[in-house]
Amino acid sequence: MQAIIFDFDGTLVDSLPTVVAIANAHAPDFGYDPIDERDYAQLRQWSSRTIVRRAGLSPWQQARLLQRVQRQLGDCLPALQLFPGVADLLAQLRSRSLCLGILSSNSRQNIEAFLQRQGLRSLFSVVQAGTPILSKRRALSQLVAREGWQPAAVMYVGDETRDVEAARQVGLIAVAVTWGFNDRQSLVAACPDWLLETPSDLLQAVTQLMRQ
């Protein structure tokens, strides 16, 4: 094992309820239906591609909405928290001399500000932000190559089926977490190498892989 790359929203940070609230506020401007509690359960079964298609947003509208959501999410940073157990997990992983990184569709400004506020920035050797909503494959491949890591010795940890797909396409160890956006059934169908129920499960997976 050389490195572990994390998604940000829904994997490290419990930001999805805030993102949904912001997206709902912009629904009238973009012509899609706001998400209620009943819709959210259905939404967790869909890929990002399906959500965008059903919303009927053009590429220009997608970019504009993402910019608005990221800007308002930045205003909400003081209220956002790590998922329970994540801070301890990150510290333990770094103590094993593993490189830690973040690759996310969120903005660099938001990610850096949150990490600094939480006192976690020094744990990460690389932060790559602003990746496309629908596919992270190219950005993930470029990051691994730039850092000189061997794909088979790198984990990508995310909460969406698109994260699993991107990791598998690049030849990384695909790790899915069940506490984020996509539900467990959808993640199982995406066939990750590891499916985690709690942050401590990742430490167990890493321990097992490092013994091989």
From Swiss-Prot:
One Pfam family cited in the UniProt record for this chain: HAD_2
Class of this enzyme: hydrolase
Name this protein carries in UniProt: Phosphoglycolate phosphatase
Keyword Thylakoid: no
Function comment: Specifically catalyzes the dephosphorylation of 2-phosphoglycolate.
Binding-site residues, Mg(2+): 7, 9, 159
Reaction(s) this enzyme catalyzes, per UniProt: 2-phosphoglycolate + H2O = glycolate + phosphate
GO cellular component, one term: cytosol
Keywords: Calvin cycle, Carbohydrate metabolism, Hydrolase, Magnesium, Metal-binding, Photosynthesis
A biological process term (GO) from this entry: reductive pentose-phosphate cycle
Membrane spanning residue stretches: none
Domain of life: Bacteria
Pathway(s) served: Organic acid metabolism; glycolate biosynthesis; glycolate from 2-phosphoglycolate: step 1/1
Cofactor: Mg(2+)
Species this protein is from: Synechococcus elongatus (strain ATCC 33912 / PCC 7942 / FACHB-805) (Anacystis nidulans R2)
Active site: 7
